[in-house]
Amino acid sequence: MMWCAPLRCSTTVSYTHLKEVFIILQQAWTARDWTPIRPFEKEELFRMHEAQLREYVRLGRINVVERINVNQAYLHLYRRDAQYEYLTIYMAVRMGDYIIDEKTREVLKGDPNREYDMRYLLTFTRRLGITTREAGGAACACCPNCGAPMHITNAGQCEYCGSDITTGDFDWVLSNLDSVKPETRLDERGVVIDPPQ
């Protein structure tokens, strides 16, 4: 069994890592296999996406998301409260997005030959004071607590040490994902430090 080497830590976050998480999420959505995204999503968001995906499976549909190109990603908002830090990342993305029947492959919605420009706000959360592990990006599949190969239970725990790694206690986890519509008013405050309770 191969274990990950000790990693250096940082108080910063990598935009490359955050983009990778977004792309892994889209690929898992198309594959209708939510397992790959488990280490990167907070419990509540994971359960919501899992339920949405089960509904696609129940209906016999596949939401195909392909040719994903993150054109722009920047820190839109940083917020901190007494326990957690929150990064809201703005992403401008161009990608194919359509729905097909799983058996006939007939296109039910959208156009497989067209790409759409979409905007998202992704909120990542981690416990205050935690440092980010420097590694090979989102593809690094090691437990942030014990360094064991990443095998996560359905409850979001490391199979080896039992640590719940999807809470933000070890690293940034995706806690919210919103599509930005033309009528969406963006919070332009930048940095928000809530007073300690």
Write out the residue ranges for each language-model feature.
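Short metal-coordination and nucleic-acid-contact micro-motifs, chiefly zinc-binding Cys/His arrays
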Residues: 136-140, 154
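Structured, amphipathic secondary-structure segments that form assembly/contact surfaces
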Residues: 4, 9, 23-27, 34-134, ...
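Amphipathic alpha-helical repeat scaffolds
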Residues: 19-26, 144
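Cys/His-rich metal-chelating microdomains
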Residues: 149, 164
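Conserved small/polar residues in nucleotide/adenosyl-binding loops
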Residues: 13-17
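Short cysteine-rich clusters marking metal-coordination/redox-active sites
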Residues: 143-146, 158-161
